[in-house]
């Protein structure tokens, strides 16, 4: 039986793999190997001259054909038990990443037959005892992060309501908001487009405005 664990960090020398959970236009990105009828999240072994982020970027590009993407670390995972890539069964460690892909190459030049964009997670996994747990962990962390942003956003709005004055312009308000959000430990936030500022679904209107999305 395989055991999957998660860590905030481990010694870099222990990281032997990188797995990259990916989405594109709101859909999950999965790969189908030429020799298998199952689907998998892109990932692979770390090469001798790479840091683990370089491994993640290379594997993502090779296996999905990603040309333009944003990638960020999620956490460290480990697997204990024998697998096709670990015949000793000892605990092995990897870096878990998330990537948002905005552009793909027209052709793949790897062992992958094709890349599939899915609305839902697949039923036929290549690594059914590992990769579903990695995605579950990613979603859990995202929910926790979003809740943190929501709380920081509400506190920021209350702060702005207290300090705002008629002579303050939008750029000054934005600067105050960014400083307060950073002070509260939020590294992402909703921002505004000429006239209103929007945080995690809450809006304080200064004048008619459109909503904008999340910004890193």
Locate predicted features:
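Short glycine-rich loop/turn motifs
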Residues: 17-19, 28, 193-196
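Conserved hydrophobic "DFG−1" position in protein kinase catalytic cores
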Residues: 20-22, 30, 99, 200
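Glycine-rich, aromatic-bearing surface loops/beta-hairpins
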Residues: 136-139
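Active-site neighborhoods and metal-handling regions in enzymes and metal-associated proteins
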Residues: 142-216
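Conserved Nudix-box catalytic region and its N-terminal flanking loop in Nudix hydrolases
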Residues: 23-62
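Acidic, metal-coordinating catalytic segment for phosphate/diphosphate chemistry
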Residues: 1-19
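Unchanged
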Residues: 46-70, 77-133
